[in-house]
């Protein structure tokens, strides 16, 4: 009559390392090999890069663009970028808009309350160079002499896409440990 053909099945008791097409398997040995080849600092930086919690200082028109960035259309949560209201829970400070001499001590105090490691993003022409208020008696110029700016996002105001790109650049700096933020 007919011949009975043997069919090969993936029985985990026979060969647990056998690959099944379309199925991703992780074995303990693969995890151990990954950990042996990876430095602990690289794993820590991977976690830091994928969980940036930022505190905003919305001054001027850049604050409106920051609010737009937080809407569902841009979905910054997919990058691990989450806003925080407390400086003690944030590791990124976004300085946006102009900084006045009266506001500077409060901004420094918020910076001091943030735990290390911490990073700073300067968003908008006003934060970077003073913008149209450059020659004003009350505007602080050269904010990068006061705070260690890691990423500059130019524009007046920069679009939400530019802010997201700035976060991606910061993530790459953290991954490569080329950020000039505070010590670890």
Curated annotation (Swiss-Prot):
GO terms for biological process: aerobic respiration; electron transport coupled proton transport; methanogenesis; methanol metabolic process. The keyword Ribosomal protein does not apply. Signal peptide: none annotated. Its EC number is 1.5.98.3. Residues 1-20 are annotated as: Disordered. GO terms for cellular component: plasma membrane; respiratory chain complex I. It catalyses: methanophenazine + reduced coenzyme F420-(gamma-L-Glu)(n) = dihydromethanophenazine + oxidized coenzyme F420-(gamma-L-Glu)(n) + H(+). Optimum pH is 8.5. InterPro entries: NADH_UbQ_OxRdtase-like_20kDa, NADH_UQ_OxRdtase_20Kd_su. SUPFAM superfamilies: HydA/Nqo6-like. It comes from the Archaea. The keyword Oxidoreductase applies. It is a peripheral membrane protein. [4Fe-4S] cluster binds at residues 61-62, 126, 156. Its cofactor is FAD; [4Fe-4S] cluster. Optimum temperature is 39 degrees Celsius. Keywords: 4Fe-4S, Cell inner membrane, Cell membrane, Electron transport, FAD, Flavoprotein, Iron, Iron-sulfur, Membrane, Metal-binding, Methanogenesis, Methanol utilization, Oxidoreductase, Transport. It is found in: Cell inner membrane. One of its GO terms (molecular function) is quinone binding. Binds 1 [4Fe-4S] cluster. HAMAP family: NDH1_NuoB. The FPO complex is composed of at least 13 different subunits. Belongs to the complex I 20 kDa subunit family. Component of the F(420)H(2) dehydrogenase (FPO complex) which is part of the energy-conserving F(420)H(2):heterodisulfide oxidoreductase system. The membrane-bound electron transfer system of the complex plays an important role in the metabolism of methylotrophic methanogens when the organisms grow on methanol or methylamines. Catalyzes the oxidation of methanophenazine to dihydromethanophenazine. It shuttles electrons from F(420)H(2), via FAD and iron-sulfur (Fe-S) centers, to methanophenazine (an electron carrier in the membrane). NCBIfam families: nuoB_fam, PRK06411.1. This is F(420)H(2) dehydrogenase subunit B. It comes from Methanosarcina mazei (strain ATCC BAA-159 / DSM 3647 / Goe1 / Go1 / JCM 11833 / OCM 88) (Methanosarcina frisia).
């Amino acid at each position: 009559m007919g011949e009975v053909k043997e069919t090969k099945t993936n029985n985990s008791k026979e060969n647990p390392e056998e690959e099944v097409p379309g199925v991703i398997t992780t074995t303990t040995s693969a995890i151990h090999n990954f950990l042996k080849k990876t430095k602990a600092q690289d794993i820590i930086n991977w976690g830091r890069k994928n969980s940036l919690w930022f505190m905003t200082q919305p001054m001027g028109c850049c604050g409106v663009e920051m609010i737009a960035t937080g809407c569902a259309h841009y979905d910054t949560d997919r990058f691990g970028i989450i806003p925080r209201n407390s400086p003690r829970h944030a590791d990124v400070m976004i300085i946006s808009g102009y900084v006045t001499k009266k506001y500077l001590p409060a901004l420094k105090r918020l910076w001091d309350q943030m735990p290390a490691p911490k990073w700073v993003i300067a968003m908008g022409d006003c934060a970077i160079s003073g913008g149209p208020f450059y020659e004003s008696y009350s505007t602080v110029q050269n904010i990068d002499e006061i705070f260690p700016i890691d990423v500059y996002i130019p524009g007046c105001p920069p679009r939400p896409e530019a802010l997201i790109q700035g976060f991606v650049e910061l993530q790459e700096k953290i991954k490569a440990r080329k950020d000039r933020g505070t010590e670890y």
